Amino acid sequence: MAALRVLCGLRGVAAQVLRPGAGVRLPIQPSRGVRQWQPDVEWAQQFGGAVMYPSKETAHWKPPPWNDVDPPKDTIVKNMTLNFGPQHPAAHGVLRLVMELSGEMVRKCDPHIGLLHRGTEKLIEYKTYLQALPYFDRLDYVSMMCNEQAYSLAVEKLLNIRPPPRAQWIRVLFGEITRLLNHIMAVTTHALDLGAMTPFFWLFEEREKMFEFYERVSGARMHAAYIRPGGVHQDLPLGLMDDIYQFSKNFSLRLDELEELLTNNRIWRNRTIDIGVVTAEEALNYGFSGVMLRGSGIQWDLRKTQPYDVYDQVEFDVPVGSRGDCYDRYLCRVEEMRQSLRIIAQCLNKMPPGEIKVDDAKVSPPKRAEMKTSMESLIHHFKLYTEGYQVPPGATYTAIEAPKGEFGVYLVSDGSSRPYRCKIKAPGFAHLAGLDKMSKGHMLADVVAIIGTQDIVFGEVDR
């Protein structure tokens, strides 16, 4: 009978399936002998908590997971401290900057110097006045002869001598060639740091030609030791003045090409205008000099205000900026190169004949021809290069308008043949002290533009 009932049930299911639109309903067979038991709800809830028998202390406990989502915490944002250099290619030497950044904004910029310190001022105290001269080539190793000129003027002031006119004109001539060397390096490496490579390659070819002038007049491409106390070491070789004239005539065309690339370039203007602004008051308070001072609108040039050698006999203009930003300083350097070409042309036209050293055997060595015939000349030569010449006791501060600014030498003599003290005032030292002020509030990438516009060389900063 049971099998018959099951068979009838399956027939009913088949009929429901075959009927269109009919849903399948399986018959529910209640289990025999099973009685469902429903407990008391309150009694059952005591087993649903975190503990089986909760007390007052454990009643608020929750079953796991206790913390599906961490509660939000107070976010603490700290400024990042970043080391810029001393291996950075845009550091222009061994500059190390400890910078505090808020995102990419510079909040603090602390320069750390001294990584190129060689004890130059102390070493000079153990050398004669002539032996100390090559140390000045290694200070600002981009504008070599200007450093020599400052030291030579200081020694000549203590000795109370004045070099011959031809020597002074040669000094001014090569001082302006050195200014061209420095400004080419400053402008093109500044552009290279900001991504413009072409000016660097174009103008370094011209720089090599000026190194050739150095080599022809002194035998060395960079560290010349050419300008010495009492005059210059050698006279100009034949044909050199003609070559310098030809170079200066063509170099103005190179400057035109430089300005075509940069002056109205949209990217260059965006990266330099209103970047690193220094007001005239701030420039004076920080002790800026040179282009860093003139770019802020102060017309101060030692070649005009306190002329040395024959700068009072040449005509040139002093370019001055108005905004005090990186762009104004770039324009000042380009215009200074044009004014240097004017001075070079005047030096070539006004170059007088005559001696190139002071006519005093106690200071300048005698000529080779005299040494072969005169015993006194041989003795003077020997004593000059072994003991050196005695400088009367006294002290002097002598400053010149170097390409980077006011380069000063404070020289103290005790009457011996060696300096008692030689303090060197480097323009880049004061400029680097203003880096924090100039870069505060700018982006990290703008710090590179500010370092480039300061024209820093660490030979003179660290000494």
Curated annotation (Swiss-Prot):
It catalyses: a ubiquinone + NADH + 5 H(+)(in) = a ubiquinol + NAD(+) + 4 H(+)(out). Pfam families: Complex1_49kDa (PF00346). SUPFAM superfamilies: HydB/Nqo4-like. It is found in: Mitochondrion inner membrane. PROSITE patterns: COMPLEX1_49K (PS00535). InterPro entries: NADH_Q_OxRdtase_suD (IPR001135), NADH_UbQ_OxRdtase_49kDa_CS (IPR014029), NDH1_su_D/H (IPR022885), NiFe-Hase_large (IPR029014). It is an enzyme of class 7 (translocase). GO terms for biological process: cellular response to oxygen levels; gliogenesis; mitochondrial electron transport, NADH to ubiquinone; mitochondrial respiratory chain complex I assembly; neural precursor cell proliferation; neurogenesis. One of its GO terms (cellular component) is mitochondrion. It comes from the Eukaryota. GO terms for molecular function: 4 iron, 4 sulfur cluster binding; metal ion binding; NAD binding; NADH dehydrogenase (ubiquinone) activity; oxygen sensor activity; quinone binding. Belongs to the complex I 49 kDa subunit family. Core subunit of the mitochondrial membrane respiratory chain NADH dehydrogenase (Complex I) which catalyzes electron transfer from NADH through the respiratory chain, using ubiquinone as an electron acceptor. Essential for the catalytic activity and assembly of complex I. Redox-sensitive, critical component of the oxygen-sensing pathway in the pulmonary vasculature which plays a key role in acute pulmonary oxygen-sensing and hypoxic pulmonary vasoconstriction. Plays an important role in carotid body sensing of hypoxia. This is NADH dehydrogenase [ubiquinone] iron-sulfur protein 2, mitochondrial. It comes from Gorilla gorilla gorilla.
